[in-house]
Amino acid sequence: MTNIRVLIVDDMAQVRSDLRTVLPLAGQAAGLQIEIVGEAGNGQEAIQRISALQPDVVLMDLEMPVMGGYEATRQIKTHCPDCRVIALTIHGDETVRQKASQAGVDDFIVKGAPINSLIQAMAKEKE
């Protein structure tokens, strides 16, 4: 079974909690072992934790206080170019997608999409 280490970055505690609960179960059903190695409530916290946690995948909200996902992604990609950053956002318009891509986001999932979409995006890390 493929192991994927995940850092969840979102300012909403409920979103982090839901992902922490659902991802390992959905991953297991897809033949993946998803390990939630940590959480952060904003981009600055994520950057502070990235070296110690060494995730394969960072699930990144784009709009957060203190430091948003765009700037956090740019900094994460500088220090950890092999980390796969997947944006999780309520904004699915093309302008947001382009801005995320320019920041270094590897994949883009609109919140509320089927969990399988997120699992597939995470599985790309290990292909």
Regions found by a protein language model. Give the residues of each.
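Receiver (REC) domain active-site loop signature in two-component systems and cognate sites
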Residues: 64
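Active-site residues of response regulator receiver
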Residues: 61, 89
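Conserved sequence signature across two-component system core domains
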Residues: 9-10, 40, 58
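Active-site beta3 strand of CheY-like receiver
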Residues: 52-59
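Alpha4 helix (beta4-alpha4-beta5 surface) of REC/receiver domains from two-component response regulators
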Residues: 71, 92-109, 113, 117-120
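Acidic catalytic/metal-coordinating carboxylates
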Residues: 42-45, 68-71
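Two-component/phosphorelay signaling modules centered on CheY-like receiver
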Residues: 13-38
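Non-catalytic signal-transmission and effector/linker regions of two-component phosphorelay proteins
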Residues: 1-5, 30-33, 116-127
